[in-house]
Amino acid sequence: MDPINVDFTGRGRDDGKKGVADVLIPPEHSGKKIAINIILTLILGAVLYYFMIPALNFKSIELYLFVVFVCLIYLLLTIISSRAFIKPEYLPYVKRRSRVPGILILALAAVALVGWLTGVTLFRAKSYSKLISVQDGDFAEDVAEIDFSSVPVLDSSSANKIAERTLGDLSDKVSQFVVSPYSTQINYKNTPVRVTALAYGDIFKWIKNTKEGLPAYIIVDMTTQEGQLVRLPEGMKYSPTEHFNKYLLRYLRFKYPTYLFDEPSFEIDESGSPYWIVPIVDKTIGLFGGT
């Protein structure tokens, strides 16, 4: 065990406020334990980042939470490695090792608070009013008349029920997949339709089918109320219902680590090729407001 240095010279005169608990007593092999704690924090932090996937952007509130969690991991490892929870004499040592993480947490909290206050609607109403530019126009010229036979007669809930029935056409794999919540109404070949992606039935069916990907998608005609299953020559390998590296937002995060992403939507082009549309957003008022 490393030697304990205690001042008996009187230079550190007792002012009535210090006690035995204020004597800094490092645990045995403290240097080695610090190195191990740092390495474990980096490893656990990497795992945490993999699952949280925060944008490396000060406008992302998830980034602040991620850094706070990493600091808390280091503090917890310091307490465990020093055994301060059963040996109170090591508490001053833990407090000393906690200074930098503690200061970092307070600094991030201050930055986040100021960033939030500078974006509060009450203080920045004028800025919010300028988010959308207003342009004058002529309704009769800007909005063309449409054929009433092209007016959608289904709502999203009814269209999803038709999609669930249409999934039965995937007879060879119908038990492996379900209709996903990702559906979008678009104009496809001048016809209003709702396109719906598939999802894996459960984790075991994902394990069985993830290599081939999602084999099809469904089109529901919003005027004729007919559903069509469209098989793909190659399955969709990335989607919001995937896991690990094929999870859509994780795949995008590793390619674009600083971007702020909005919710993805599923669409197809005029040739029927499927796409995931993921908007990139920016915060223009304060740190977290004015999307």
What are these model-derived regions, one by one?
Residues 2-291:
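Soluble extracytoplasmic regions of secretory-pathway and membrane proteins
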